[in-house]
């Protein structure tokens, strides 16, 4: 089994958390979306959406995050011979509810404009370069260019940004209420619902928004402290973004983009 992913990707974090929690072995391939590696023709042919993660088991390829997690759940049950009682209807409902909030727009809105626009321009140049290399994929690459411009338009729309924030606030308020009576999101046992939520909280922390969105909610703050102690969190997220590590991770990527842009090597 192979997983194409990157530590920056929320959906990648979700799948990796599930893999670690289930104890499933896999081969890891890093595909950095900020440096444009997800636009390489070999990856693009496998996944024309150019989104992460991509899970592959032999000839079987799964692109949807929840479908990947459900597939991993079935693998774990077959391997153990025991049905996971924590994977129930409530868990699935929470998984889908959490996914409804789109993190990309919110994240980009909290990145300084000069850096965001610099990376955006770099990625557009990467797409154009790959289009020249693989003309048979031109229509798919054109679609990615349109998506990039659409995203920039949304970032200029105060209404779109407000709706994204309001959606997140409603979700966190609902989680806060739920955690009033349970240790974890779908009960007193850790489940795949938590796997979907944890990367959202990690993203807020990465953006230095923990005080506003997490600490201000008592139950959520206690939950956040609890899940960060899990070995899966430490391996998937903590090793890249805890303390000084987040600066090392971000600086390394930023320098790559700067150098490639200066050399015009896309």
Swiss-Prot record:
Superkingdom as given in the UniProt entry: Eukaryota
The enzyme's E.C. designation: 2.5.1.18
UniProt domain GST C-terminal: residue ranges: 120-250
GO terms classed as biological process: response to toxic substance
Any one annotated GO CC term: plasma membrane
Database matches in PROSITE patterns: GST_CTER, GST_NTER
Catalytic activity: RX + glutathione = an S-substituted glutathione + a halide anion + H(+)
Gene Ontology molecular-function annotations: glutathione transferase activity
UniProt cross-references to InterPro entries, sorted A to Z: Glutathione-S-Trfase_C-like, Glutathione-S-Trfase_C_sf, Glutathione_S-Trfase, Glutathione_S-Trfase_N, TCHQD, Thioredoxin-like_sf
Keywords attached to this entry: Cell membrane, Detoxification, Membrane, Transferase
Sequence positions that bind glutathione: 9-10, 38-39, 51-52, 64-65
Domain GST N-terminal positions: 1-80
Major place of residence: membrane
Keyword Cell membrane: yes
Entry's localization field: Cell membrane
Family from the record: Belongs to the GST superfamily.
PANTHER family per UniProt: GLUTATHIONE S-TRANSFERASE TCHQD
Function: May be involved in the conjugation of reduced glutathione to a wide number of exogenous and endogenous hydrophobic electrophiles.
Name of the protein this chain belongs to: Glutathione S-transferase TCHQD
Species, as recorded: Arabidopsis thaliana
Recorded name of the encoding gene: TCHQD
């Amino acid at each position: 089994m192979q997983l194409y992913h990157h530590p920056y990707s929320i959906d990648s974090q979700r799948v990796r958390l599930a893999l670690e929690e289930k104890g499933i072995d896999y081969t890891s391939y890093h595909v950095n979306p900020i440096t444009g590696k997800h636009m390489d023709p070999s990856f693009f042919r496998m996944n024309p959406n150019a989104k992460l993660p991509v899970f592959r088991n032999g000839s079987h390829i799964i692109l949807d995050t929840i479908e990947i997690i459900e597939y991993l759940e079935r693998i774990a049950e077959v391997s153990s011979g025991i049905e996971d009682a924590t994977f129930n209807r409530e868990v699935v409902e929470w998984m889908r509810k959490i996914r409804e909030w789109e993190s990309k727009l919110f994240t980009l809105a909290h990145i300084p404009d000069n850096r965001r626009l610099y990376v955006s321009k770099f990625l557009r140049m990467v797409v154009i370069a790959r289009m020249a290399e693989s003309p048979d994929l031109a229509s798919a690459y054109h679609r990615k260019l349109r998506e990039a411009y659409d995203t920039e338009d949304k970032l200029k729309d105060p209404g779109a940004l407000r709706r994204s924030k309001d959606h997140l606030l409603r979700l966190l308020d609902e989680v806060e209420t739920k955690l009033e009576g349970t240790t974890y999101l779908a009960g007193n046992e850790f489940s795949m619902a938590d796997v979907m939520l944890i990367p959202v909280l990690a993203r807020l922390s990465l953006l230095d928004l923990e005080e506003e969105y997490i600490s201000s909610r008592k139950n959520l703050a206690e939950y956040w402290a609890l899940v960060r102690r899990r070995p899966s969190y430490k391996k998937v997220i903590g090793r890249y973004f805890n303390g000084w590590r987040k600066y090392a991770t971000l600086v390394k990527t930023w320098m790559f983009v700067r150098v490639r842009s200066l050399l015009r090597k896309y």
